[in-house]
Design a protein with these regions (language model features):
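Catalytic, metal-anchored helix/loop core of enzyme active sites in primary metabolism
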Residues: 1-319
Length: 319
């Protein structure tokens, strides 16, 4: 039985991770959970999964949660100290980093030093501190398993070919809700329009960033660090159907890709069970039902966030 801790348990990735764990309750135990301040949902998770430690960000939320869950006897920590306690909880084997932003850097570093396997959904950790995280993981012999669907697809496409040089990574993008529009078409869009992703169910920040291709730019940086490739070896391909989640082209011209339905539980479960696979409920990919698979070059004139991300990655450093 693998023992799992989750940073960001009440967010999109966190709740889907717990869904996978619930489906395979005989294989996993939840040891520690952390969230922002959504104590109502965290309380539900505490009562269902019975972790041995939880953390919330604010002292006020923690005080309220302690009262609400006094009958459980589960310690409630706060702030960065709480995140670090969850990240390094002694009994945990895998840490799922599903919080948003640079807040994930310190807990990830601490977890690596505590020799926890990292299931990485917090791309900002590598975007801003990949030059620290990757060498540190190598030093401590810690695996970093990608949870982002695209990076999981690349990771899976590399299995069994680790010694074979690659030509390039084909990083797919759906194009978001505004694919095909030009600058003048985007002057009066509303937040609710940007939150209507055509294929994926994700948190609000990632969904907004996907609508501008900024998220894809961050994924380019993440791929650079995860797979040790040059920026010139990462090619973004707009693939509106989101069936091919990404691919790797090898030096001989062969392309190996990972296909599947747009369900984040797939890469989550792959990371939790790695290197094994296990049955997962849900819709299967039906090749006969697919009308077509199409591919386009990204419109970097309209969606400048992607080209800006490449420029930032070339310069390196932080602002």
């Amino acid at each position: 039985m693998k023992k799992i801790a989750i940073l960001g348990s009440t967010g999109s990735i966190g709740t889907q991770t717990l869904s996978v764990i619930e489906e395979h309750a005989d294989d996993f135990e939840v040891t520690a959970l952390a969230c922002g301040n959504n104590i109502r949902l965290l309380e539900e998770q505490m009562r269902k999964f019975r972790p041995k430690l939880v953390a919330v960000w604010s002292k006020e939320a923690a005080a309220s949660l302690r009262v609400r869950t006094a009958d459980l006897g589960i310690p409630v920590e706060t702030g960065m100290d709480g995140l670090l306690a969850v990240a390094t909880y002694e009994e945990s084997e895998i840490l799922v980093t599903a919080i948003v932003g640079m807040l994930g850097i310190r807990p990830t570093i601490a977890a690596i030093k505590a020799k926890k396997t990292i299931a990485l959904a917090n791309k900002e950790t590598l975007v801003t501190a990949g030059h620290l995280i990757i060498p540190l993981a190598a030093e401590y012999g810690v695996s970093i398993l990608p949870v982002d669907s695209e990076h999981s697809a690349i990771f899976q496409s590399l299995q069994g070919n680790e010694e074979n040089p690659i030509s390039k990574i084909l990083l797919t993008a759906s194009g978001g809700p505004f694919r095909g529009r030009k600058k003048q078409d985007l002057l009066h869009i509303q937040v609710e329009d940007a939150l209507k992703h055509p294929n994926w169910s994700m948190g609000h920040k990632v969904t907004i960033d996907s609508s501008t291709l900024v998220n894809k730019g961050l994924e380019v940086m993440e791929a650079k660090w995860l797979f040790g490739v040059e920026l010139e070896q990462i090619e973004v391909v707009v693939h509106p159907q989101s069936v091919i989640h990404s691919a790797v082209e090898y030096e001989d011209g062969a392309v190996i890709a990972q296909l599947g339905t747009p369900d984040m539980r797939l890469p989550i479960q792959y990371a939790l069970y790695y290197p094994k696979r296990k049955h997962l409920s849900g819709k299967r990919l039906d090749l006969f039902a697919l009308c077509d698979l199409t591919f386009e070059r990204p419109d970097t004139d309209t969606f400048r966030g992607l080209s800006l991300a490449y420029d930032a990655a070339r310069r390196g450093g932080n602002i």
